[in-house]
Amino acid sequence: DTTAGPDTTSAPQPTTPTGLCGFIRRQPLPEDNLNALNFTLSNFTVERWCAREPEFKQFLAQSVSDRCFGNGSCGVESGIPEVFIFPGFPVVNSPLLVRFYVRLQVNSSVSVVLERTVLTSILDRVLENLTAEFGVQFSVDGGFTEWSPFGPCSTSCGPGIQVRFRNCTNPPPINNGSDCVGPRNETRPCNNGSCPIDGNFTQWEIWSGCSVTCGKGVQRRFRSCTKPPPSNGGQDCIGDRLETRECLKPPCPVDGNFTEWGAWSKCSQTCENGTQVRFRSCTNPPPAFGGRDCMGPTNETRACNDGPCPGRLYPHGLLANDNLLPNRDAFSNFCGRINLFNQEIPFFIRRHRRVYICRNGMLKFRRSAIIRYPQRFPGPRNEDFLFRFRNSYIIAPYWLTISDDAFEQPINTSKVFYRIYSKFSRRDRDVLDRANHDVRRFQTSVPQFEAQWVLVVTWLQLYPPTFPGVRLSNSFQVVLITDGQHTFSLFNYPENGIQWSTPTGRLFPNLYPPGSGLPVAGYNAGDRNLPFFNLPNSGTVNIQNIDQMMGNTNLTGVWFFRLEMNSILSLAGKKCNEWSRQRTSRISPTLPPCPCLFGQATLDKRYFVDYNQTVSKRGNGTICAYSLPSGSRRWVQQCCYTDLPSGGKVLSSSPPESGGPYLIALPGSPVISDADGHEFCCSSSQCSLYYRLRPPRSCFGYTLRRRGLIFGDPHFTTLDNTTYTFNGLGEYTIVAIDDEAFEMQARTARTSGRGLGTAFSAAVAKERGTATVEARINQKAGDLEVLIAGKPFNISTITTTGTNIPDGNITLVRDSNGSITALFPSNIAFTFTDVEGTLAIAFEAPDDFKNRTKGLLGTWNDDPSDDFVTPDGTLVPADAAPRRIHYEFGLKWQINASQSLFTYSDLESPSTFVDLSYIPMFIDNITWVNDSFRYEAVKACGNNTQCLFDAAVTEDTSYGINTKKLEDNNNEINKELANFPPKILGPKVINATIGQAIEVKITAEHNSSDFFVFTVNNLPDVIILANTSRYLLIRWTPTSLQKVEPVFIVTDSHNSSSELRPLILLCPCANGSRCIDDEEVSNQRNKGFSFLLLSCTCPAGLTGQYCQHKIDACVENNQPCFPGVKCTDVSSSSNGTRYQCDPCPKGYSGNGSICEDIDECSDANVSKCDHSCINLPGSYVCDCNQGFSLEGDGTSCKDINECLISNDCMQNCTNLPGGRTCSCLDGFQIDPKDQTACVPISRCDTFKVGCQQVCVMDRGQPKCACHKGYSLNADGRTCDDINECTTHRHKCSQICHNLDGSYTCSCQPGFNLSPDQTTCEDIDECGLINEAHCEGSLEICINTMGSFRCECQDGFHRVNDTCQESLPSTNGPTGTTGIVASSVSIALTIKDADLHEWQARLSRMFMDAVAKVVVDYCKGNANGNCYGNAVIAKRYTRSISGTSLVARVHILNDFPETRDANLLVAFYVMLSTNQGEVYVMNKDSLLRALQESQTELSWAIKKEISEIRALKVDDESPTPYETREDGLEMIWLLVGVSVAVAVPLMIVIVILYREYRRIAKQRRKTNNFDLRQWSGARERTIYSGFTNSKSARL
């Protein structure tokens, strides 16, 4: 067995005696035995082995060493291999057996055994060599490894086997060694217990019976896991043990069940007994197949918001500290002006600073004149096709014509109260909170709204013009709320606050058609294409119900509107106002004046120049400088400089570019900064507000600043500009001001080079009340150090805008070149700069310190001769030699320890920096190290002595060049600081008038210049009258309205310039009109405009923006005459108005402008009525007592024979004056329960006699009779029903329904049955509370008998079911394309006519005549082609016959035109049918109709009409708008055009209304009104349900 390993017992035991070879064998350790190897030698004797054993050991040790330490595979980095033979070996067998191991001697005390695997590997590589070396084959037989553990059992259950293994690798056979002998694996039996048995299902059982007897049920069947069941851990069956299937039986009854309650609805009221409703339904499930219904209610109601409502009105009156609009007569013609001062109100795209409160129920923002007679917004069009109120900014909660006399009554006086509430007043908090609450709940888009101010205006007890005859009054309120960005208004109408809309109160409402001066409620934005709004029923009688109507707030009598559009503009205005109200916006403390020149600002150390406009932005070319803050104050002076046309910059002193006091904003502060305040105010027309709080500052008071400099090896430039050199070594007083307790000291140190010069290495300064500021060069690090109060300061924290040192009461500033300046409270500046390791020091002070300085910078008094004064007052001459200046002046200012301000280390004092042996080089005796360096220095310095001196002392020409640069720079600085611009003198405002010459003189002043050059730029049409060295005189004649911005520039002999940019106020007014600086001009001025066109106040008879047109004074004065009274433009009138009103209509008294109704009923001689008299506006009507009718003369009353009309007596009827009486036949008497019925006096047995209804004893004989409502038949016994409806025995005004023995009455749609149960009364749909039928602000609801219609207000017509201004382009149902007005228009000429006549009378006559001709033509030509392009049409073609037709005439824009002495008129016609169709009339048909009726048309207008033709291109107007829409409809539509015409028509209407009110009409109602408010260009109301409503609208 040749194995080697841990099983030592298997190795052959030694058979040779110990020490066979005579060697002493080392006793092996256990680890040696584990790692030993055996090898065999064939044909090798013991003796031979013994002889060569040492050689073997040496060979093997060398092999181990070579292979082990070469690749580090032995586990140690180094060692000495030693081969050991086991004791008793070799064993004498055949072959010879040797056992050995190898140890590695790591050091003297440590050896380790070589692992067997490593030894085997080595031996495998060297055996062949070993064989060759010893001449005999060395072989290693293979050896088994240990047995591995037995593996797992071969089966998981039941009997199995386990296997274990060993390998012949311990070692493997080497060099033909023998393989291992023996098995390589062993097995043994194993058993893991019984095997599991998986379960299996049985067969399914049969299905069970159905689980229910009705409806849907289930059947079931089962199976089990028992074939076989699972055992010994076997798996259970996989699958269902139960199966179900649906089975159907007859349906079962299903009882209904409620769903869950739905959510509660929105509360019906925001306060005071609101309700909420929630619902559920019986659908969970619904009852079915005979099941029971749900038991219980389907809805529930609960109370909500049961708290009391605040009154509809905000606090008002004297108890609310309101102001009372004075009752003076002036306020009957003018509105009271309320100035808002610093506040503004955004109103759509404009902002206003004043509000006009008018006693007749409106607020205005421009012009104080009262508009007496209301008209719906936007008002009618004028002759220029412009709406009347296009320039009127109006809020009208209830604009009406009132009695001015009621303001003078001692009791029940009309009053107008007003008050402004401010956010900044504690007393106003309650009203502000209420306003904020209202805005947030009615306008949810601004949940954080905070009002800045609120205006509350309350009108109380306004009476109609018929006061005191009519004592009904109106009270209402408007609330304006704004935060500066958003504006809202509330219209509040208290309960029973609105009692009248007509002069007759609530009597005879039908006498007042829409538009006849009735109250208007809404608003008008005042600019073309901006919103206007009319409340429902505005301008109609039914506006009087506004206090009972639900407003758009869901509250009765409360309406809410948003009144602005431009949020960006408004936001700026809001922020400007917020800024102005901050406490930080208060007037600033005294601040320094601005430097006069931009160069001074850049050099004055007290100012920071914001080149990049990082602080506050101005216009292009403008740069601002800021004074540095002092101490803890945040106020600084802002100075802004604008570009000059000729180059350079000049101080701006006019908005919006100018500066002013400026408050530095605190980081994170919520307040608005001054920079933002300027931007907000000047972008929202409020620049003046900003500059009122931040007034611009000129350079007046800016004084000369003088700069002294010490630099180089040291050279001094005194404050009187004397330059000398003093290179002492030590510490010296540079400048001292005793009364200000200011002193600056400096320290010198030797310069490099020859050691003959010094330079400043440190400086220190202090003022009374401040810390010391010390600067020094760190000699080790070579950089600049700063100490404040003796402590190092981090200079990286010093900024260019100034770093305040609160504890030191100083400000430090870093320049862009690295210089650091210390600013003291006295405005003294101390600047130090590191120049290549030396300090350059500058002292700068205002000229307040003249005659107060001493020290090495001399005495500042502008006299260089006395600069060298010693501390004891000795004067050294200014021309003294440098040596004398050094010893007799400079060294005298050396300081000692008691005087020093410096900071020293423990071993330092002033004497530390003094060397008594030091003798400097003097500047008058410069010596050079050699000529070549001298030549180099002269080349670099030129003749600059200071430069040459410093180069010679330091042996460095760059040092000298730096000295030269510092000196030159200081000279330039002093020159710039001393340079002041000329003062230009001229007008700041130039008032000019177009076409008129004006002369302007410009002069200048300067204290050191007597020569000036004047120029003027940007001024056309200018004539230079004189241009001398002292003044400029020009003449300017403005010839156009082109903007000019002149700039006057004056330049002095020092090339300094100033400019004057006057504000140009140009008056463009023509025809002697007057220019005014109104709100519009003020807004432009506030924006900083430098050229403004003034507004014009036109004298009577002129109009236009510049009063360039003559106008009708009637138009100018808002049609001042009483409605229906003709207004005539006259050159003059007795009252100076330039218009004249015709006399008041019959029935009125007054001056034609104000007409009061005459009560004819008060004088029986006038009215002559038989019975009673009813007074009407302008007239009266007689009325008769019941039972009488009015005769044709209108005054007499005639008895009505009731027995002939609707006789309701059962038997006999007798007519009486004013009535009738019923009586009975013999045997009957009047029924006490019914005075028209008869009952038997004596009854008999009806059964015996055989009577069907009644048996009566007549003269002792029984007779049959009938009840009321029946008639006795011919058989004398039976009764038949009398049909009262066919026999005219009923009193129904409309529909009669016969009943058995009686009848009932009913009404057609649109009527209600009156309490008498017979009469039908018309429903006024337009007056129904909270039920509007016409949509939008442009429609007016017109009540008709039994129905209503919706009409577009004047100036609009219906297109595509909406009211629009102009002819539409549509793609209607018929597929028509867009319509151009000119393509369907006719032109004709009216001879000998002008525009005045057209406006006064011809327009109405002409359009009425054309409308009549068109209707007659189309009716008479039923099959003709009248209908052209469809605007609103059916899908089929139909005939006109049997159709009501309305024609409307539309005049094109810019027509009529005046041509010679004639008028050219262009127009088209629109046709409306009662079928809801709207057409543009066919042009050919229109032309034919007019040509056939040319004579009729001429007769109708009393002017000759000629040249009727289709509109040609040459005739066309540039824009296809129409000017009006009038038509010939039913005659009553014309009522209200003129009071004079209207009065008799009103009387007829009253009579007809009373006589024929039973006539019914079928009505078609539109959908409910849905209030919409737009903020777009023009309100466009959108309709729904057109198919159901078009007939009613037309």
Swiss-Prot record:
Residues 400-566 form the NIDO domain. It is a single-pass membrane protein. Component of the acid-insoluble and acid-soluble organic matrix of the aragonitic skeleton (at protein level). Its main location: membrane. SUPFAM superfamilies: Growth factor receptor domain, TSP-1 type 1 repeat. The chain crosses the membrane at residues 1531-1551. This is Mucin-like protein. Keywords: Calcium, Disulfide bond, EGF-like domain, Membrane, Repeat, Transmembrane, Transmembrane helix. Residues 1063-1108, 1110-1156, 1157-1191, 1281-1321, 1322-1364 form the EGF-like domain. GO terms for molecular function: calcium ion binding. Residues 568-706 form the AMOP domain. GO terms for cellular component: membrane. Residues 141-196, 198-253, 255-310 form the TSP type-1 domain. Disulfide bonds join 153-190, 157-195, 168-180, 210-247, 214-252, 225-237, 267-304, 271-309, 282-294, 1067-1075, 1069-1096, 1098-1107, 1114-1127, 1121-1141, 1144-1155, 1161-1173, 1169-1182, 1285-1296, 1292-1305, 1307-1320, 1326-1341, 1334-1350, 1352-1363. Residues 1552-1593 are cytoplasmic. It is found in: Membrane. Residues 706-901 form the VWFD domain. Coiled coil: none annotated.
